[in-house]
Curated annotation (Swiss-Prot):
Keywords, comma-separated and alphabetical: Hemorrhagic toxin, Hemostasis impairing toxin, Hydrolase, Secreted, Toxin
Record protein name field: Alkaline phosphatase
GO MF term set: alkaline phosphatase activity; toxin activity
Keyword Hydrolase: yes
EC number of the protein: 3.1.3.1
Keyword Ribosomal protein: no
Tissue expression as described in the entry: Expressed by the venom gland.
Phylogenetic lineage: Eukaryota, Metazoa, Chordata, Craniata, Vertebrata
Broad class of the protein's primary localization: secreted
Length: 20
């Protein structure tokens, strides 16, 4: 939930790709 996606998946993935 680094980018506020609220996902339980690897947060580093969202932080890198900027998804959600």
């Amino acid at each position: 939930d680094i980018n506020g996606g609220g996902a339980t998946l690897p947060q580093a993935l969202y932080q890198t790709s900027g998804v959600l």
